[in-house]
A protein has these predicted regions:
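Conserved alpha/beta-domain cores
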Residues: 1-157
Length: 157
C-alpha cells in the first residue's frame, strides 16, 4: 500500500492518484506486470478531518497521525516543554475528531487505523475500539501492554 501524508484537500489526493495512474500506464507500456496497490492517507490536519467524508471516497484507508493532529488542532508546539501542561491529547475536540474520522471513513468504505502516541494509550484503548477503529498502531515496546488491555475488556457489552 501507499500512504500519502499531510493531505488537506480532495484535489491533492486526485492529483496524486493521477500520477499513480501515469506510472501504471508507463509500466503497462513496458509490459511490466504489477499488482493493484491500496492507496491511503494520513489524517493529521484539522482540514483533513473536516473533509474526511469526501476523502474517504477517494482512498482505501485512513491512518490517523494523532501527534500532529493534536498539535495542529490545539495550536501548540509539542517541542516546547513549557507547553507540556496544555498539550492534551485527551482534549474533547481531539476525541470528537477521532470519532468523526472513523465514522466518515467507514461510511466511505475505508479501513481506519490510529497511530501516534494515542494508539498506545491504554486509557483510551476501549474508547478507540468502541469507536470502531480497525487497528491500533503501537511501538513494539507497547504491544504487550495494549494486548493485555484489549484482553481485559468486555467488548460485547
Amino acid at each position: 500500500s501507499i500512504m500519502y501524508p499531510m493531505i488537506t484537500s480532495v484535489w491533492e489526493v486526485k492529483q496524486i492518484k493521477k500520477i499513480v495512474e501515469e506510472v501504471k500506464e508507463e509500466l503497462r507500456a513496458q509490459n511490466i506486470e504489477f499488482g493493484e496497490v491500496a492507496q491511503g492517507i494520513m489524517i493529521e490536519t484539522p482540514a483533513a478531518v473536516m473533509i474526511s467524508r469526501e476523502l474517504a471516497k477517494e482512498v482505501d484507508f485512513f491512518s490517523i497521525g494523532t501527534n500532529d493532529l493534536t498539535q495542529y488542532t490545539l495550536a501548540i508546539d509539542r517541542q516546547n516543554p513549557k507547553l507540556d501542561n496544555i498539550y492534551d491529547s485527551h482534549h474533547p475536540a481531539i476525541l470528537k475528531m477521532l470519532k468523526m474520522i472513523v465514522d466518515n471513513g467507514h461510511k466511505g468504505g475505508c479501513w481506519v487505523g490510529i497511530c501516534g502516541e494515542l494508539g498506545a494509550d491504554t486509557t483510551l484503548t476501549e474508547t478507540f475500539l468502541s469507536m470502531g477503529y480497525d487497528e491500533l498502531s503501537v511501538s513494539p515496546s507497547m504491544i504487550l501492554k495494549v494486548r493485555q488491555e484489549i484482553r481485559s475488556l468486555d467488548l460485547k457489552a
